[in-house]
Amino acid sequence: MTKKITVLVCGGGNGAHVTAGLAASRDDIETRVLTTFADEAERWTNIMKENDLRITVDEGDIKSGESVDFKVKLNCITKDPSKAVPGADVIIFTVPAFAHQSYLEAIEPYIQPNTTIVGMPGQPGFEFQVFDVLKDKAKQCVIMSFESLPWACRIAEFGKFVQILMVKVNLMGCLIRGQSKPSYDPMEAVQRVMGKAPILTQANNYIEPILATKSIIHPPIMYGKWKDWDGKPIEEKPLFYQGLDEEQARYLGGISDELVATAKAIAAQKPEVDLSGVLHLYDWYLRDHKPYIKDTTSLLTVLQTDTAYDGLVHPMKETEDGKFVPDFRYRYLTEDVPNGLVVTKGLAQIAGVPTPYHDEVIAWCQKQLGKEIIVGDELKGKDIGSTRCPQRYGINTMDALVNIM
């Protein structure tokens, strides 16, 4: 018989609704929710007095293909970490990367040895941040980070109804055990929350998913599209992926080349670090998006003809006269630069790999964000503290990178 575990879900958004709902539907899981945003916990608690949380899975049960529709009751929703954290075996972060710091600081006083802390998604630099906030306590915990949310999902009615629109087949994560000795299998515990799908797979180490991250895709496309923009509003929203041109593809491919070079450099200096899972973006698309791609000639044609991206446009703001200007404060830059591109640049800097494409794109992005992160080709700007690059946490050598494992 599997050991009963207590799962704490951090957050109150789409991912939190689904994660808490799935966990609460399992007989051998006690489920709690911690949401520190405004009065969200109080609102949700009051809703639960009169209602259940309904979850629908549009894709249906993986085996039967029938749609699934079920209801659960959440008995513990709070904004008080002293009530939520003690006794929790697994703590799952479903909030965006910018909120990780505040949640880590909230749970830190109450965290116990052998707890599993899960970033879902963690995003690049999650591990550095956990060790920075939890200090020695982190060494007694299991740290896990997954590459994305397991589903496409949306809240239909806050606290009452959430829809799972798509379930991923596989989801890769990494695991740092440290000195922890949990009485349960951490990967099995998270799989228990998920159910049959997605199937969770484990990366070779925590560095591999950082260099294989997909959060490097948006900034170079934004840069290639808008670097020479004249500031005048345009008539319609341009397609993001399918509107790719050769210039944007050159920057995207160049950044991917630099990641592959960084993986090779780290593996050459530390042969025990297996980074064989770091693929060029072109090869990754051919592997993971193949059914959707009509023309596999190049990275440019792959994105232009990827039907999974049908209709996806650049983040834009509408002007008073119904035209459009680019939104440079959208998550494509606000999230994917400090918690993506800057982290991969940081690894390359430690490995001694030149990154002209990273440097050029980051230099433009930081202007749009009003930050100074990169100076020349080095991460030493005054706003380095707003990123999750290893240098921010005093990690500047290959030994320091590897010692975290």
UniProtKB/Swiss-Prot annotation:
Gene3D superfamilies referenced in this protein's UniProt entry, alphabetically: N-(1-d-carboxylethyl)-l-norvaline Dehydrogenase, domain 2, NAD(P)-binding Rossmann-like Domain
UniProt xrefs under InterPro entries: 6-PGluconate_DH-like_C_sf, 6PGD_dom2, NAD(P)-bd_dom_sf, Opine/Lysopine_DH, Opine_DH
A Pfam entry, by short name: Octopine_DH
Record key words, sorted: NAD, Oxidoreductase
EC numbers: 1.5.1.-
Signal peptide positions on this chain: none
GO MF entries: oxidoreductase activity
Family classification: Belongs to the lysopine/nopaline/octopine/opine/vitopine dehydrogenases family.
Protein name per the record: Opine dehydrogenase
UniProt organism field: Haliotis discus hannai
Gene name of the encoded protein: tadh
